[in-house]
């Protein structure tokens, strides 16, 4: 794409209108409203309301059309003239066998047309050569000076143009024989455009009226037979668009001089010269391509005459010899100088030609007569040819978008409209570039469907579509509206009454034209890219025609009606430079463009779009339409419809006409009747008296057209009996035929008597308006001296509305008068009305009241309210006198001023004294408010109110009293704000102040008579601080230490107070110390992520015996849904503050816990083993995972006797009690194996040892705060010491001592047997290696100092042996199961029962005691080995067994388990059956972590401390022998404080 050499300057924008919805509802009314403005521009644009968006109703899939082909540079008039001129010169040289080559000058193709035109303007070739003015010619062609371009132009002119001009002058034409001139570039061979052949117009195939169907009569296209017969057509067919082809088989003979005795040479074949095409195809965008190189040219021939000549064959006949005579001199001598014409075979002497030739030219030669015949053939009409390809909307859009994107090398939507506009006008003015586009124009909507919804469509319309189908802006509806003239034409005139569709692409254009019959047109762009319009107003239409005719006379000489053919453009800048006013606009999607009568318009498309257009005619068009018919008559142009027929048809039914239309039709009918009378009178004067009636409306239009002016006749026509196929209008009666007048007769539609009758009907319809207008005129002008009443004028206005009278100036005056009268009445009602609305109406001034009275008197109607207005005026004057008296009397009385103000407001009239009265009243009222606000005994006002009062004072008019009060009020506010700022600082400052400081501030601020919010807040804070100090003193001086909850509440309140409190820091330290102790106790007792609180663990489990309650609360604690610290002991928050109540409740809880666990044992013992085959579904055990314990490795809790999956709980390790200091006989001492299992519901804490608890009790003794957890810990310690004493007493009894000795003896026997027998084969690195490896990690040193117990716990957690380190034991134990025998001891029932009861009580304690394990060992030895449990534990300890379930407990799995619990709880009561079937495991118990803590804290094993069990047994045996006969005596019932002193003296 090349930039244009001349920049295009866009014309000014046309008017753009945006109607409101009210205006938009009347399309033709709105167009009539804007016509005075828009008509001056010729075109205008209308933007509908934003929400008016009609649906696109075209069937896109079935819409197929064939577009027209447009070559842009053939559209512009001046460019087409240049192309036609080049075609003529090319044809001139082609006839003589030479192709035209356009030379290049200064790297541009030489404009031959402009060169010839300038030469002619400068006086012609001879004059320029004589005066040597070729340099001036070069300058006028805008070539630079100083390069000798004038001489080059002269040579080109002499070689190419001058021979053609000599020929055009009429003299005999000969060819010049000059040497070729050198040029900067090789000449470009010119390819004739053959515009008429390739731009043939195709008439419409649609079988209805067409507004352009008669512009050009259809011409039969040349057939192949015609082409073969016509050598010129054949030549055009061969040399079509593009380079000429070589090798067509054209043969010619050489023409030589005729000599009688010369021999005929052999035939010689010569190829045609190369041809260079100036304009290529559209896809090449005007690039010039050379078909052949000039190297093939033979420069021995003349440069412009590359041709072959043919010699005449020898003829022996005498007739042929006699024909050898020169056509100029008529002599036959000098035959050797004869030259034979290849066209007509005539002979010429070379010296008889003008100018004479020195020799016979080689190649084809034609005589001047043949050249004249060829070049003078009339040009054919120019038009558009149809494309050969049929498109759908999609395929055309793809082609259009692709073309635009490729042309501009950017996306189509990013190309600015200004760039496209400049490029379009550059292309249409370019001779070199031949860009071709396609335009789907004048597509019939009746055949292809309209873009708007229509009621007679093939499918049902939605309510929205029906609304748009009936809208007046629908282009199918607008032409047939009642106010439109075209609704009275029955025929569907395509393009006028029936819309046409337009599918455009970039650069596709519509040329300068006016609408048929100079009607209105409206165009709506449905969608797509904008359409650029140019318009010229009707007043400049003839000026535009004159300019185009003057600039391109060559086109209009042959086609006078060229502008009516829509095929010619001219640059708007060119028109504007010649004084033609042009406007432009860009029509976007959803916008209308309206063209007014006889307004020339043109334009082009910015890209792919879809538009629809139609014509319409209003009443104001009728005079314009009559003028158009006269214009058509002069141009002899066909009419689309008969204007006379339209007028008569409307006149036949005047009652159906809109009144505006009736008035306009009456005027036109009157003029038409007068003209008809004149013409018929002329006919009578010619002696034509014969006449007959003819129904012209029934005849086809082509049968009633004047043969002279082509006008469609209706009222009358002149015909001849002898020439039945011809008729003329009465304006051309002399052009009918040469027959006698007696044979001619008049054909008429109406008689001269019928026409006045029709006119009278129109007059009656129109006079109804005149009569009404006379009444209105008389009423408004008061012609008879009597004013009409307001009601009479209102009746006249209603009559105009009912009878649809036009919106004339008189009606506007009437409406204006009524509007003024209504305004006066409204003002009067506002003055005299007693309603509340009267007070809301604005006051009027006294001057306005006087003007109102005057206006009511001047109106052309009478109103009875005028007397009431006079009474109001009298009252106002009396009020003025009273106001003046009040203003002059001092001092001013507030009551009198208020009374006068209220009276003035009642009058609703503002007098001049009212402003002064209002100022005095405002001053008095404000001073009264200040006085009340500062009164000592009055209520104190806030700072906001006082500030508002001061602001009000600034708006009051100044006076001495006002100024004084204003100053006092300002001083008071300054002082108050100062104290407020101090109080605010005390409240918000980071450093708090003492109560004494605050008391001083409050006391001093009390003297200010203003309510100060910050001072009040400071006072309240001080009061709260004093109350807080009193509470602290009371709680510190009580009988008992204060509870932690009370101290925390006091600390929270004290921190929020903006007062410095000395007691607060002491309380904070106490609370911090208490929390530190509580945290230390929690770490000691609670497991990691435990779901229990510390108080829950320390207190007895009161719900141990209730399956439903215990498990329900355990589940709720798992989910974090249940917290009942204050409900554990059945005490209220107040009872927890009493130590005695806590101890009593703890004792009661112990008893409930024992009873509950016995009850739970009884229930669970009835359940069968999960490993048994006979299981009762109603008594099965449910694991914490929610599944039934059946068919998998399950363990039974030794406390509650319920069953659990071994994979869902932490299981004990069999050899955790075996120590390296013992022999391997311990592997066979199965009663020492760690097989004890407590479920997560029974063992709730870490169960620390008493040594660890001692350090907590020592810290508790130092606290000056009471904690429920501390008192619970004291009770738990007392309970554990009591149980320990009873356990030691039981172990020291004779029976138990004997059993212990027997058990030791059994272990010794096992050792002896191993010494005498070969030990069993053990794998490498079995238990001894394992125990040796882990001995340093399992055995903890004995710590005597109690203060290091906590550190020992932490260290023990870090040195727990890993399960995988004892692989030898795990491999050995299965082989030893068959060697286990038992029972080892025989326990009598009297001995077993107390021990089992002690065992149960010990398991309930959340404390680890050595005696617990001793009792467990005795009970185990007194029964058979539990091989089932041992086998289960062995299976669970296998590496491949997923028993270590803690590795699978991801957070996601825990959340799913909790969700499962919650879902299972919704809407259900936790009965025993439901809970046992829906039990879930704890998400917070992590067996893997607890396993590492087990050796010290014992999650599921009651005892794993470093004290050797055999040493404990020995200690009890020694005690039987007298060393420690009564251990229980050392544990009397002690108070908590006595327990602490005992721990200091005893070593456990």
UniProtKB/Swiss-Prot annotation:
Comment on bound cofactor: Binds 1 Fe(2+) ion per subunit.
Organism for this UniProt entry: Mus musculus
Zinc fingers, C5HC2 class: 706-758
Zinc finger (PHD-type) residue numbers: 325-371, 1182-1243
Quaternary structure, from the entry: Interacts withPCGF6, MSH5, ZMYND8, AR.
Residues given in the record as 2-oxoglutarate binding sites: 439, 521, 523, 531
Description of its domains: The JmjC domain is required for enzymatic activity.
PANTHER family with a match to the protein in the record: LYSINE-SPECIFIC DEMETHYLASE, LYSINE-SPECIFIC DEMETHYLASE 5D
Biological process (GO), any one: regulation of androgen receptor signaling pathway
Region (Disordered): 208-229, 1438-1468
Family: Belongs to the JARID1 histone demethylase family.
InterPro entries tied to this protein: ARID_dom, ARID_dom_sf, JmjC_dom, JmjN, KDM5_C-hel, Lys_sp_deMease-like_dom, Zinc_finger_PHD-type_CS, Znf_C5HC2
Disulphide bond pairs: none
Residues the record lists as binding Fe cation: 513, 515, 601
PROSITE patterns, sorted: ARID, JMJC, JMJN, ZF_PHD_1, ZF_PHD_2
Top-level EC class as recorded in UniProt: oxidoreductase
Keywords noted in UniProt: Chromatin regulator, Dioxygenase, Iron, Isopeptide bond, Metal-binding, Nucleus, Oxidoreductase, Phosphoprotein, Repeat, Transcription, Transcription regulation, Ubl conjugation, Zinc, Zinc-finger
Cofactor(s) demanded: L-ascorbate; Fe(2+)
EC number: 1.14.11.67
Pfam family, one: KDM5_C-hel
Compartment(s): Nucleus
Name of the molecule in the record: Lysine-specific demethylase 5D
């Amino acid at each position: 794409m090349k930039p244009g050499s001349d920049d295009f300057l866009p014309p000014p924008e046309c008017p753009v209108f945006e109607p409101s919805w009210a205006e938009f509802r009347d399309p033709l009314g709105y167009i009539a409203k804007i016509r005075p403005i828009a008509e001056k521009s010729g075109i205008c644009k209308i933007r509908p309301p934003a929400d008016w968006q009609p649906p696109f109703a075209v069937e896109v899939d079935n819409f197929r059309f064939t577009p027209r082909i447009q070559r842009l540079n053939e559209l512009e008039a001046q460019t087409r003239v240049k192309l036609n001129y080049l075609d003529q010169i090319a044809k001139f040289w082609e006839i003589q066998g030479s192709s035209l080559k356009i030379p290049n000058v200064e790297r541009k193709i030489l404009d031959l047309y402009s060169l010839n035109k300038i030469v002619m303007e400068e006086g012609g070739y001879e004059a320029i050569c004589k005066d040597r003015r070729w340099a001036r010619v070069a300058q006028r062609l805008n070539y630079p000076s100083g390069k000798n371009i004038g001489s080059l132009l002269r040579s080109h002119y002499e070689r190419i143009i001058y021979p053609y001009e000599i020929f055009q002058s009429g003299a005999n034409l000969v060819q010049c024989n000059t040497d070729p001139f050198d040029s900067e570039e090789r000449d470009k061979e010119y390819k004739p455009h053959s515009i008429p052949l390739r731009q043939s117009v195709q008439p419409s195939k649609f079988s209805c009226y067409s507004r352009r169907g008669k512009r050009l009569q259809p011409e039969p296209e040349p057939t192949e037979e015609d082409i073969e017969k016509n050598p010129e057509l054949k030549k055009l067919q061969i040399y079509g668009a593009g380079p000429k082809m070589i090798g067509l088989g054209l043969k010619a003979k050489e023409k030589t001089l005729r000599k009688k005795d010369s021999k005929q040479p052999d035939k010689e074949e010569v190829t045609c010269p190369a041809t260079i095409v100036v304009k290529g195809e559209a896809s090449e965008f005007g690039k010039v391509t050379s078909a052949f190189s000039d190297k093939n040219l033979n420069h021995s021939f003349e440069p412009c005459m590359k041709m072959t000549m043919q010699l005449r064959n020898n003829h022996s006949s005498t007739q042929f010899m006699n024909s050898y005579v020169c056509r100029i001199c008529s002599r036959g001598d000098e035959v050797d100088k004869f030259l034979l014409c290849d066209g007509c075979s005539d002979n010429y002497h070379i010296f008889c030609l003008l100018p004479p030739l020195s020799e016979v030219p080689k190649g084809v030669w034609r005589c001047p007569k043949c050249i004249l015949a060829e070049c003078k053939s009339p040009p054919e009409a120019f038009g558009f040819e149809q494309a050969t390809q049929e498109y759908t909307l999609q395929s055309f859009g793809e082609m259009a978008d692709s073309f635009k994107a490729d042309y501009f090398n950017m996306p189509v939507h990013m190309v600015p409209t200004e760039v496209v506009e400049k490029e379009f006008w550059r292309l249409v003015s370019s001779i070199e570039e031949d860009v071709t586009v396609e335009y789907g124009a004048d597509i019939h909507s009746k055949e292809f469907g309209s873009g708007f919804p229509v009621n007679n469509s093939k499918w049902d319309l939605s309510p929205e579509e029906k609304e748009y189908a009936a809208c007046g802006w629908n282009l199918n509806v607008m032409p047939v509206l009642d106010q439109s003239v075209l609704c009275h034409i029955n025929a569907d005139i395509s393009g006028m009454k029936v819309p046409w569709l337009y599918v455009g692409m970039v650069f596709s254009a519509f040329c300068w034209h006016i609408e048929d019959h100079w009607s209105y047109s409206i165009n709506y762009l449905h969608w797509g890219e904008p359409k650029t319009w140019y318009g010229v107003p009707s007043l400049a239409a003839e000026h535009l025609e004159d300019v185009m005719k003057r600039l391109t006379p060559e086109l209009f000489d042959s086609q006078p009606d060229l502008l009516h053919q829509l095929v010619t453009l001219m640059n708007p800048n060119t028109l504007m430079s010649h004084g033609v006013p042009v406007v432009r606009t860009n029509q976007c999607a959803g916008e209308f463009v309206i063209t007014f009568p006889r307004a020339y318009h043109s334009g082009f498309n910015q890209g792919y779009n879809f538009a629809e257009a139609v014509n319409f005619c209003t009443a104001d068009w009728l005079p314009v339409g009559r003028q158009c018919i006269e214009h058509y008559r002069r141009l002899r142009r066909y009419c689309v419809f008969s204007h006379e027929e339209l007028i008569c048809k409307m006149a036949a039914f005047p009652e159906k006409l809109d009144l505006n239309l009736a008035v306009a039709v009456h005027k036109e009918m009157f003029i038409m009747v007068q003209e008809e009378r004149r013409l018929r009178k002329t006919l009578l004067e010619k002696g034509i008296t014969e006449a007959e009636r003819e129904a012209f409306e029934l005849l086809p239009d082509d049968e009633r057209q004047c043969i002279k002016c082509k006008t469609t006749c209706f009222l009358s026509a002149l015909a001849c009996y002898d020439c039945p196929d011809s008729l003329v209008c009465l304006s051309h009666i002399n052009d009918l035929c040469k027959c006698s007048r007696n044979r001619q007769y008049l054909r008429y539609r109406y008689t001269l008597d019928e026409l006045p009758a029709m006119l009278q009907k129109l007059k009656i319809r129109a006079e109804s308006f005149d009569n009404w207008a006379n009444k209105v005129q008389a009423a408004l002008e008061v012609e008879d001296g009597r004013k009409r009443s307001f009601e009479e004028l209102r009746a006249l206005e209603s009559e105009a509305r009912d009878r649809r009278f036009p919106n004339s100036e008189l009606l506007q005056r009437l409406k204006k008068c009524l509007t003024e009268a209504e305004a006066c009445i409204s003002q009067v009602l506002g003055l005299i009305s007693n309603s509340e609305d009267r007070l809301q109406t604005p006051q009027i001034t006294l001057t306005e009241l006087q003007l109102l009275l005057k206006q009511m008197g001047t109106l052309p109607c009478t109103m009875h309210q005028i007397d009431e207005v006079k009474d109001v005026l009298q009252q106002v004057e009396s009020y003025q006198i009273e106001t003046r008296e009040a203003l002059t009397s001092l001092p001013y009385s507030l009551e009198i001023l208020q009374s006068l103000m209220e009276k003035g407001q009642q009058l609703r009239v503002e007098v001049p004294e009212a402003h002064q009265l209002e100022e005095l009243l405002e001053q008095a009222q404000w001073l009264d408010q200040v006085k009340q606000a500062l009164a000592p005994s009055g209520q104190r006002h806030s700072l906001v109110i006082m500030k508002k009062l001061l602001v009000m004072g600034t708006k009051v008019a100044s006076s001495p009293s006002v100024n004084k009060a204003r100053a006092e009020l300002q001083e008071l506010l300054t002082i108050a704000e100062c104290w407020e700022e101090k109080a605010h600082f005390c409240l918000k400052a980071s450093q708090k102040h003492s109560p004494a400081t605050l008391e001083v501030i409050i006391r001093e601020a009390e003297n200010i008579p203003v309510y100060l919010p910050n001072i009040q807040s400071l006072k309240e804070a001080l009061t709260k601080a004093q109350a807080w100090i009193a509470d602290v003193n009371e709680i510190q001086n009580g009988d008992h230490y204060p509870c932690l909850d009370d101290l925390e509440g006091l600390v929270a309140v004290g921190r929020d107070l903006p007062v410095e409190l000395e007691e607060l820091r002491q309380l904070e330290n106490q609370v911090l110390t208490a929390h530190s102790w509580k945290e230390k106790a929690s770490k000691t007792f609670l497991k990691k992520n435990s779901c229990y609180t510390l108080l829950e663990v320390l207190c007895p489990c009161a719900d141990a015996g209730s399956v439903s309650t215990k498990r329900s609360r355990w589940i709720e604690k798992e989910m974090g849904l249940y917290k009942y610290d204050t409900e554990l002991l059945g005490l209220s928050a107040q009872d927890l503050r009493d130590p005695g109540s806590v101890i009593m409740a703890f004792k009661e809880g112990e008893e409930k816990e024992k009873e509950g666990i016995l009850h739970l044992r009884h229930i669970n013992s009835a359940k069968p083993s999960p490993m048994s085959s006979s299981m009762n579904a109603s008594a099965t055990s449910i694991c914490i995972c929610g599944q039934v314990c059946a068919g998998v490795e399950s363990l039974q809790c030794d406390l509650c006797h319920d069953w659990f999956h071994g994979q869902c709980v932490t299981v004990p390790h069999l050899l955790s009690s075996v120590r390296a200091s013992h022999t391997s006989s311990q592997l066979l001492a199965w009663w020492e194996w760690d097989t004890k299992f407590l479920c997560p519901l029974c063992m709730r804490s870490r169960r620390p040892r008493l040594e660890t608890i001692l350090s907590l009790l020592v810290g508790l003794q130092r606290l000056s705060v009471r904690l429920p957890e501390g008192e619970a810990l004291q009770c738990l310690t007392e309970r554990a010491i009591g149980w320990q004493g009873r356990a030691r007493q039981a172990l020291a009894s004779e029976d138990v001592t004997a059993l212990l000795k027997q058990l030791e003896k059994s272990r010794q026997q096992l050792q002896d047997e191993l010494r005498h027998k070969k030990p069993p084969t053990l794998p490498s690195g079995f238990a001894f290696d394992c125990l040796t490896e882990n001995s340093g990690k399992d055995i903890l040193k004995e710590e005597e100092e109690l203060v290091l117990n906590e550190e020992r716990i932490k260290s023990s957690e870090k040195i727990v042996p890993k399960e995988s380190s004892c692989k030898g034991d795990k491999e050995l134990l299965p082989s030893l199961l068959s060697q286990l025998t038992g029972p080892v001891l025989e326990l009598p029932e009297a001995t077993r029962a107390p021990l089992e009861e002690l065992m149960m009580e010990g398991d309930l304690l959340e404390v680890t005691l050595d005696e617990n394990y001793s009792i467990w060992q005795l009970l185990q030895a007194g029964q058979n080995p539990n091989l089932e449990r041992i086998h289960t534990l062995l299976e669970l300890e296998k590496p491949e067994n997923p028993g270590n379930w803690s590795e699978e407990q991801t957070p996601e799995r825990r959340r799913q388990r909790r969700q499962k619990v919650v879902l299972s709880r919704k809407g259900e009561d936790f009965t025993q059956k439901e809970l046992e079937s829906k039990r879930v495991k704890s998400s917070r118990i992590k067996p893997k972590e607890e396993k590492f803590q087990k050796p010290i804290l014992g999650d599921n094993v009651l005892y794993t401390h470093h004290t050797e069990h055999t040493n404990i047994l020995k200690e009890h045996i020694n005690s039987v022998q007298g060393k420690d006969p009564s251990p229980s005596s050392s544990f009397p019932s002690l108070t908590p404080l006595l327990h602490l002193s005992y721990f200091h003296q005893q070593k456990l």
